[in-house]
């Protein structure tokens, strides 16, 4: 961790017209050469930030800021710039409220996790019919943020009859009865899938796996905000899974601000490697994020 005097020396050097910093001792024989380069790189990058530095000097917040996990230099999350984080640690509070419950399958559980951990930012919950129409017709959420695929929770008429029109319910894992999280219901609506299938999938062929799923999943949809129980996530999270918050912290810690994203459903091969290397070269990126498609496969 650099001292205030060391930070002041670097900032003063830059403010006086210096075009480079030599880190002879620490980078050559020190215990933390990579970390040293990272923090100095950040000081250089942030030395023009008027919030913390003024006329080559730093204020009392500067050291804490430079050593914090601030995401100021990383591109803002999609939408209004705020990463959606909707988790609940106090599961007992919801247990004693004796709320209605709804059993959900693996696909819906996956959506609850992705929404609540911010993967689907700026989406905060399952869509209502009006929002589905906006997405399919205009590629826009009701907030006017760009979005291209409906995220829905379909249920049967039998389940719909048990739910309140508004308010909180507990979401239950249909496999083992574990409590997944809470859904704060905005609406329960009759859903005519035939009105959406063509624009959704580009076909009405009932052999199409997506079409078949929508037709068979029930003729009601529930919209509302999702919240994930931390206790459930701790039980189910795989060691290779990273949330958006975690990946952003990794980017910051490594001093990466320009990152190439590569989304794939296949094991990377030579063709992928060529594309990835070219993308890194063209964009002069700091790193590449490999984002594999995982989960339930289409059959």
What would you call each of these model-derived segments?
Residues 4-7, 34, 266, 270-273:
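Conserved structured core elements
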Residues 27-52:
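C-terminal helical cap(s) of enzyme catalytic domains, especially alpha/beta-barrels
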Residues 2-5, 25-36, 239, 243:
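Catalytic cores of large soluble enzymes that bind and process phosphate-bearing ligands
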Residues 2-6, 37-42, 276-280:
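Short, solvent-exposed amphipathic alpha-helical segments in soluble enzyme
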Residues 56-299:
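Nucleotidyltransferase catalytic core that binds NTPs
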Residues 9-33:
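Glycine-rich phosphate-binding active-site loops on the catalytic face of alpha/beta enzymes
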Residues 1, 14, 21-23, 260-262, ...:
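Hydrophobic faces of well-ordered beta-strands that scaffold small-molecule active sites
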Residues 1-16, 52-59, 68:
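Active-site-adjacent loop and "lid" segments of alpha/beta metabolic enzymes
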């Amino acid at each position: 961790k650099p001292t205030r005097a060391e930070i002041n020396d670097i900032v003063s050097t830059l403010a006086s017209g210096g075009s480079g910093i030599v880190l002879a001792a620490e980078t050559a024989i020190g215990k933390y050469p990579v970390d040293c380069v990272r923090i100095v790189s950040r000081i250089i990058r942030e030395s023009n930030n008027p919030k913390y530095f003024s006329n080559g000097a730093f204020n009392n917040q500067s050291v804490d800021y430079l050593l914090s996990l601030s995401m100021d230099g990383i591109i803002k999350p999609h939408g209004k710039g705020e990463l959606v984080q909707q988790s609940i640690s106090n599961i007992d509070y919801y247990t004693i409220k004796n709320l209605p419950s709804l059993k959900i399958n693996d696909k819906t559980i996956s959506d609850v996790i992705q929404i609540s951990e911010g993967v689907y930012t700026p989406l905060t919950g399952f869509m209502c019919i009006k929002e589905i129409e906006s997405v399919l017709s205009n590629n826009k959420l009701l907030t006017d943020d760009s979005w291209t695929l409906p995220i829905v929770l379909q249920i049967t008429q039998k389940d719909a009859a048990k739910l309140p029109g508004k308010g909180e319910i507990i979401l239950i894992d249909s496999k083992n009865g574990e409590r997944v999280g809470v859904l704060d219901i905005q609406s329960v609506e009759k859903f005519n899938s035939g009105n959406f299938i063509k624009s959704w999938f580009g076909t009405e062929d009932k052999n199409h796996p997506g079409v078949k799923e929508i037709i068979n999943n029930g003729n009601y949809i529930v919209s509302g905000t999702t919240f994930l129980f931390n206790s459930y996530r701790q039980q189910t999270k795989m060691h290779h899974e990273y949330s958006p918050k975690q990946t952003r912290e990794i980017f910051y810690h490594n001093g990466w601000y320009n990152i190439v994203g590569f989304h794939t459903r296949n094991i990377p091969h030579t063709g992928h490697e060529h594309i990835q290397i070219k993308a890194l070269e063209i964009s002069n990126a700091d790193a590449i994020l490999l984002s594999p498609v995982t989960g339930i496969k289409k059959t």
